Swiss-Prot record:
It comes from Pseudoalteromonas translucida (strain TAC 125). GO terms for biological process: translation. One or more lysine residues are methylated. Part of the ribosomal stalk of the 50S ribosomal subunit. Interacts with L10 and the large rRNA to form the base of the stalk. L10 forms an elongated spine to which L12 dimers bind in a sequential fashion forming a multimeric L10(L12)X complex. GO terms for molecular function: large ribosomal subunit rRNA binding; structural constituent of ribosome. This is Large ribosomal subunit protein uL11. Belongs to the universal ribosomal protein uL11 family.
Length: 142
């Protein structure tokens, strides 16, 4: 019989940098999960990802205090800022542009995030990511 899921914990942890300090420790500790076991497993699975990239993770905690976790792709905002070479988005995106991304960069981001996007085809996914870029104050070039 399958184990019963007691809790779902959603966190955003930097790749290769999980440690027992907040936010990881308190979130897992209140559910009785072995924090160091999670940190070691997470850091091992994120070795192939650029160190320090934020990785959303969903942790399923079971009744016997065991756990499994699913990693998502880094947020579109992080990938867009990295592609544009800027530190943060604009405080006033409609009037103040902070950087530029090309269509080729958008397509590269779409390929990275393909598993997490709900768009039916490549063009729709590119439009979705382009909308995120514009909302952050990045201009989009064709």
């Amino acid at each position: 019989m399958a184990k019963k899921v007691e809790a779902l914990i959603k966190l955003q942890v930097n790749a290769g940098m999980a440690n027992p300090s907040p936010p990881v420790g308190p979130a897992l500790g209140q559910h009785g999960v072995n924090i160091m076991e999670f940190c070691k497993a997470f850091n091992a699975r994120t070795e192939s990802i650029e160190k320090g990239a934020p990785v959303p993770v969903v942790i399923s905690v079971y009744g016997d205090r065991s756990f499994t976790f699913d990693m998502k792709t880094p947020p579109a905002a992080y990938l867009l800022l990295k592609a544009a070479g800027v530190k943060s988005g604009s405080g006033r995106p409609n009037t103040e542009k902070v950087g530029t991304v090309t269509r080729a960069q958008l397509e590269e981001i779409v390929e990275t995030k393909r598993a997490d996007l709900t768009a039916s085809d490549l063009e729709a996914a590119v439009r979705t990511i382009a909308g995120s870029a514009r909302a952050m104050g990045l201009s989009v070039e064709d």
